[in-house]
């Protein structure tokens, strides 16, 4: 393929929908290959906007606003980075001849827990948690009774653990309904109710669909707090048999979704069984660890796969990531990083978010070592040494 020059006739254009920390790294990798990048989000000065050639601030759930930018910019690739996007606009753009990554249909299916669960469990026959759906508090009570306690309640559409809760007693049901409604994205009150799986561990299996075929990164282990990523490490130690099971599930799901790019396939492991949880058709937050562990990060893999270029998923050494969270609410925060940078074998990535909020991810510490355990220690030490004021 021939790559033109950014901002000149013949350039290759990425229209990035969503401009958070993951999108920022995608833009940086695309820029390195001479791709013209346009970043879109609902607020000004979002992380990816700071490194893109051009940016727009719109509500991406607004069909007309989104279509207006697509028609104005005429991108070669529309690259969703978040889930709060009007998928009807993506489907129509695809019909008009635009390339949506990985596909418009894949974007629609994966942002809706009902659609992806029905695809995985009912169409593909994959092992998942038992589940029910509910549209009212009464239906939720019935679903909980069917599945038994404890169980997990999630909005059909939400992100980063928003709206999720565990129901451990009948007294929790009404509270879970309220939490789901408050955390939901989009219209309607529909929720998915899942059996609580007391898993041994959970992993993300980064799966790249490329012109050369499907490739897998080494499994990534992670810790979630309130459904949100807190730390991750690679490789996560698992048997060859379980890894093969995980890859088989990931390939079936990503083949069904189609298109090119990287997918973050989330899986539970319990005993000798791998259970499908969810999938994101884009780089995954737990995959930030690949910036220090692999020959190519998940972001470089994503960009190369989109463009049909060669991809490597080779692991260089064990490593870990640990999030840096704000402990204050402040606009235009400042960072003290001197002590963090004294920690050996580590790197920092500050996201550049204009607003610090208590509990918000503002950066990530990355570390490598001879073992995952040592890397986790170093990453945590580095992250906790950053002071935000």
UniProtKB/Swiss-Prot annotation:
Name this protein carries in UniProt: Formate-dependent phosphoribosylglycinamide formyltransferase
GO cellular component terms given for this protein: cytosol
Binding positions for Mg(2+) per the UniProt entry: 266, 278
Positions contributing to ATP binding: 113, 154, 159-164, 194-197, 202
Protein task: Involved in the de novo purine biosynthesis. Catalyzes the transfer of formate to 5-phospho-ribosyl-glycinamide (GAR), producing 5-phospho-ribosyl-N-formylglycinamide (FGAR). Formate is provided by PurU via hydrolysis of 10-formyl-tetrahydrofolate.
Keyword Metal-binding set for record: yes
Pathway note: Purine metabolism; IMP biosynthesis via de novo pathway; N(2)-formyl-N(1)-(5-phospho-D-ribosyl)glycinamide from N(1)-(5-phospho-D-ribosyl)glycinamide (formate route): step 1/1
GO molecular function, a single term: phosphoribosylglycinamide formyltransferase activity
Naturally occurring in which organism (per UniProt): Methanocaldococcus jannaschii (strain ATCC 43067 / DSM 2661 / JAL-1 / JCM 10045 / NBRC 100440) (Methanococcus jannaschii)
Binding site for N(1)-(5-phospho-beta-D-ribosyl)glycinamide: 21-22, 81, 285, 353, 360-361
Catalytic reaction(s) noted: N(1)-(5-phospho-beta-D-ribosyl)glycinamide + formate + ATP = N(2)-formyl-N(1)-(5-phospho-beta-D-ribosyl)glycinamide + ADP + phosphate + H(+)
Keywords: ATP-binding, Ligase, Magnesium, Metal-binding, Nucleotide-binding, Purine biosynthesis
Keyword presence, Magnesium: yes
Entry's EC annotation: 6.3.1.21
Membership in a protein family: Belongs to the PurK/PurT family.
One Pfam family cited in the UniProt record for this chain: PurT_C
Gene3D superfamilies: 3.40.50.20, ATP-grasp fold, A domain, ATP-grasp fold, B domain
């Amino acid at each position: 393929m021939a790559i033109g020059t950014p901002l000149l006739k013949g350039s290759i254009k990425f229209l990035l929908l969503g401009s958070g920390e993951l999108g920022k790294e995608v833009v940086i990798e695309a820029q390195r290959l001479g791709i013209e990048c346009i970043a879109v989000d609902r607020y000004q000065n979002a992380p990816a906007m700071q490194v893109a050639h051009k940016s727009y601030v719109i509500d991406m759930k607004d069909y007309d606003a989104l279509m207006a930018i697509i028609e104005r910019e005429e991108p070669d690739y529309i690259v969703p980075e978040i889930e709060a996007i009007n998928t009807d606009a993506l489907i129509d753009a695809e019909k008009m001849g635009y390339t949506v990554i990985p596909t418009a249909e894949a974007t629609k299916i994966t942002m809706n827990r009902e659609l992806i669960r029905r695809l995985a469990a009912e169409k593909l026959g994959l092992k998942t948690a038992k589940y029910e759906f509910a549209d009212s508090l009464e239906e939720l009570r019935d679903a909980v009774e069917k599945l038994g306690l404890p169980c997990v309640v999630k909005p059909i559409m939400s992100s980063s653990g928003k709206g999720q809760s565990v129901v451990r007693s009948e007294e929790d049901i009404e509270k879970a309904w309220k939490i789901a409604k408050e955390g939901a994205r989009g219209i309607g009150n529909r929720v998915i109710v899942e059996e609580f799986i007391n898993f041994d561990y959970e992993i993300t299996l980064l799966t790249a669909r490329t012109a050369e075929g499907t490739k897998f990164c080494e499994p990534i282990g992670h810790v979630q707090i309130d459904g949100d990523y807190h730390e991750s490490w690679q490789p996560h130690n698992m048997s060859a048999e379980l890894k093969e099971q995980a890859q088989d599930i990931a390939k079936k799901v990503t083949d069904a979704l189609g298109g090119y790019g990287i997918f973050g396939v989330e899986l539970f492991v319990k005993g000798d069984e791998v259970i499908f949880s969810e999938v994101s058709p884009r780089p995954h937050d737990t995959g930030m660890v690949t910036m220090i562990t692999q020959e190519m990060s998940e972001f470089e893999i994503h960009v190369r796969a989109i463009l049909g270029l060669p991809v490597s998923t080779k692991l260089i050494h064990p490593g870990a990531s640990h999030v840096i969270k704000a402990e204050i609410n402040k606009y235009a925060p400042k960072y003290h990083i001197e002590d963090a940078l004294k920690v050996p074998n580590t790197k920092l990535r500050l996201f550049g978010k204009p607003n610090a909020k208590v509990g918000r991810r503002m950066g990530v510490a990355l570390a490598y070592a001879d073992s995952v355990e040592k890397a986790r220690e170093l990453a945590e030490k580095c992250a906790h040494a950053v002071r935000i004021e």
